[in-house]
Amino acid sequence: MPKPFYVKFEVPPELADKVYQAISKVRETGGKIKKGTNETTKAVERGQAKLVVIAEDVDPPEIVAHLPLLCDEKKIPYVYVPSKQKLGQAAGIEVSAASVAVIDVGGAKDLIDEIIKSVQQIRAQSG
């Protein structure tokens, strides 16, 4: 199945798994995340987000299509994950999450920094 139009670069499965782990770790170590596209959008617009995670299986895709552009504009790193269901679980909610924003990394700083670095390398290679 082709990726939705808002997916600007390919994220390897092992990196996506690391992202889910990082979101869980942020939540479990006193960090702060915003769940859902409205909350994520506000966090990006206010410049509070350290990392934005966007699910690839959002329907309709227009729900999150503005996030990559907004993140680029605000110079906030973002990454894609394949499953909104898994993203919701990692964020500690019972329902799926189209996107989440990390506001405070808590005890997951190393993991978050590693993810941001990997994303920068992927984006540099994919032009």
UniProtKB/Swiss-Prot annotation:
Name of the encoding gene: rpl7ae
A biological process term (GO) from this entry: ribosome biogenesis
Subcellular localization(s) per the UniProt record: Cytoplasm
InterPro entries: eL8/uL1-like, Ribosomal_eL30-like_sf, Ribosomal_eL8-like_CS, Ribosomal_eL8/eL30/eS12/Gad45, Ribosomal_eL8/Nhp2, Ribosomal_eL8_arc
PROSITE patterns to which the protein is assigned, alphabetical: RIBOSOMAL_L7AE
Any one GO CC term of the record: ribonucleoprotein complex
Highest taxon of the lineage: Archaea
Native source species: Desulfurococcus amylolyticus (strain DSM 18924 / JCM 16383 / VKM B-2413 / 1221n) (Desulfurococcus kamchatkensis)
Keyword annotations: Cytoplasm, Ribonucleoprotein, Ribosomal protein, RNA-binding, rRNA-binding, tRNA processing
Signal peptide location: none
Oligomer and partners: Part of the 50S ribosomal subunit. Probably part of the RNase P complex.
Protein's UniProt name: Large ribosomal subunit protein eL8
Function according to Swiss-Prot or TrEMBL: Multifunctional RNA-binding protein that recognizes the K-turn motif in ribosomal RNA, the RNA component of RNase P, box H/ACA, box C/D and box C'/D' sRNAs.
GO molecular function, one term: ribonuclease P activity
NCBIfam families found in the cross-reference section: eL8_ribo
Family note: Belongs to the eukaryotic ribosomal protein eL8 family.
HAMAP family found in the cross-reference section: Ribosomal_eL8
